[in-house]
C-alpha cells in the first residue's frame, strides 16, 4: 500500500485501500481483505497519517478450542518527517524520518503491525465461554460432561466437611 506524496498539495487527503492479508504476510486466520481508510494531512515537510483498519478472521478459542469469526478494528497514527526538519514532536514511536525528495510512502508494514497488535492476547469465542472439562475434554459450552464431580483426593476432605457445615448453617 503506497501513498504518492511527490507533488502533493498541503492539506488533508483521503485514501482507501483493500488488501489481501496474505500480501502483508499474515496467517491463514484472516479470511477477507483488510480495509484501510487513511487520512493524510500534509504541511510543508511533514505528513500526519491517521488510519483505521478493519479485517475479519477466524480464530481458535483459547478456552474451548472452537473456531469462531471475529472482526478486528484498530487505528493508528504516524508522523512522517523529512530529514533535517524540525518537527517538535516528543514521541519517537510515532515518527518516521523519510529522505528528502521521497515521492512514495509505503504503509504496508505499519498496517501489518497494527493488525497483529489488534489481536487480543486471549481469544475467546464469547465472554461466557466455559472451556473444556479438565478430565474428559468435553466442551462445557455444549452441556455438562459425564465426569464425576466428586474428588478422591483425601487432602480436601476436611475442607469439604467445613463447606457442607457452612452451607447447612446458612439454611
Predicted region positions:
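Structured interface patches
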Residues: 1-171
Amino acid at each position: 500500500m503506497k501513498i504518492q506524496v511527490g507533488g502533493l498539495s498541503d492539506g488533508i487527503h483521503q485514501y482507501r485501500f483493500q488488501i489481501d492479508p496474505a500480501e502483508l504476510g499474515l496467517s491463514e486466520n484472516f479470511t477477507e481483505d483488510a480495509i484501510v481508510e487513511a487520512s493524510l494531512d500534509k504541511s510543508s515537510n511533514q505528513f500526519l497519517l491517521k488510519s483505521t483498519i478493519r479485517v475479519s478472521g477466524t480464530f481458535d478459542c483459547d478456552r474451548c478450542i472452537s473456531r469462531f469469526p471475529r472482526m478486528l478494528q484498530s487505528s493508528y497514527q504516524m508522523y512522517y518527517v523529512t530529514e533535517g526538519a524540525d518537527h517538535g514532536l516528543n514521541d519517537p514511536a510515532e515518527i518516521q524520518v523519510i529522505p528528502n525528495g521521497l515521492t512514495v510512502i509505503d504503509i504496508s508494514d505499519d498496517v501489518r503491525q497494527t493488525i497483529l497488535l489488534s489481536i487480543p492476547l486471549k481469544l475467546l469465542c464469547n465472554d461466557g465461554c466455559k472451556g473444556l472439562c479438565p478430565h474428559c475434554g468435553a466442551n462445557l459450552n455444549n452441556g455438562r460432561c459425564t465426569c464425576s464431580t466428586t474428588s478422591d483426593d483425601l487432602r480436601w476432605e476436611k475442607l469439604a466437611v467445613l463447606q457442607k457445615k457452612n452451607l447447612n448453617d446458612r439454611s
